[in-house]
Amino acid sequence: MALTLGVAQAGSGVAAQTSASATTPSAAPSTAPSAVTTTLTVAAFPAIDEIVRSALPAWKALHPDVEVRIVSRELNDHHTAMTTALSTAKGLPDVMALEIGYLGRFAQGTGLEDLSGPPYNLSVDKARFVTYAFDQATTPKGAVLAVPTDIGPGALLYRTDLLAKAGLKESDLTASWEGYVAAGVKIKAATGAYLMAHARDMKDILIRTGLEPGEGLFFDKDSRPLVNTPRFVRAFELARAVRRQQLDAKVIAWSSDWSEGFKRGGIATQMSGAWLAGHLNTWLAPSTRGKWRSAQLPEGAFAAYGGTFFAIARHADASRKPMAYEFIRFMTMNRTQQLAAFKAQDAFPALIDAQTDPFYDQPLPFLGGQQARRDWREAADHIRAFPVHKQDNFAKEVIDTELDKVLDRGKDIPTALADAQRLLQLRAHR
């Protein structure tokens, strides 16, 4: 789940306190129970912090002697703080939330606790989770470094009114990627609306299609870059086709221009996690209620957009690790809590038990009464994990830079990909 919004309250460190009834050698034993309080520190980001906060009354009912302190920061600041804490073993929380885009960086090191075996035995619960999400947290050597809590099954959200004006139907968007671009030409001619926010969106999804077993997004299992491959060539070519035909608004996700494009009907489609439908409904473009629908991604593609995990640092306070894991289990393996997070924050459950509920059959008024949650559940079933690499974030920056040179300066695609390949080769083993 890519919930990167909101102003977060900064903080760090682990808070724990214990107290007991005082006695002296000559005093008679007290019959009153000891008041022992443990404080767990949970480091999170919006809107995971709100999900945790909402779960605390139910947690306290089960564990009245365990307090939970939430330390919340903006998404990037949070992960920077966790990187520092793991590298210095100082200021470590008991539980840390990690977004999938950052998990690879953490997984390459030795800072996270392996939860697969005793005393946690997470591997026993593997079948309870969406396969690809559990696999994302599993290293090539079989260590499981985090527990998935929510996922972001990909969807194509589109404006039915704009399609109707262009004489198009959903299948015109989804039959093929080339057909999707061709539909964009008709939409632009008939309505003036752009097909998508940014041509980069096309690249982002297409490089995730057609991966061979064992291949990562940018690197293979031996850290060799995979940029000079047909999927990158096609991704760049179709992104360039979008830009050349002026089908993208050239706006970046979460910018004010992006949200205005949705409000004013200037952007006809958006590929994203299913959670975006909730954001459009609640604050991005509530006035467009009923005009949107959700479809599977074009050409039978399935992809994940975001996802959140809970982890324990290897050097976190050992005395609190059992209770920290109990808290993680409560957040991730409790059907009631998983459904509550979905209903309140559009955090699609990673727990399979929480994917069978009448809530999935409810029509969504924002999507014109469509029972879209069924489609999102189906998409989650088809998504497959690919290995993450510690240089994935760097690789994404390189690819984005080279694509921008193609889109904005007319750089030829073979040269752009060759330059990216060279840079990734230099960085792959660092």
Tell me what each language-model feature is.
Residues A35-A47, V66-V71, D94-V95, L145:
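Short, well-ordered beta-strand elements
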Residues A58-F129, K165-G167, G261, G265-T269, ...:
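Extracytoplasmic "Venus flytrap"/periplasmic binding protein-like
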Residues I100-P153, V181, G210, K291-R293:
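Hinge/lid segment of periplasmic solute-binding proteins
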Residues S116-F129, L173-A175, L195-M196, E215-R234, ...:
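Short, solvent-exposed loop/beta-turn-alpha elements that line the ligand-binding surface or hinge
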Residues P140-T149, G154, E178-P225, I267:
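Extracytoplasmic/periplasmic solute-binding protein
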Residues A183-K186, D222-I252:
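Glycine-centered hinge/linker elements that transmit conformational signals in sensory
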Residues F236-E326:
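Extracytoplasmic/periplasmic substrate-binding proteins
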Residues H279-S287, G300-T401, H429:
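C-terminal lobe and pocket-closing loops
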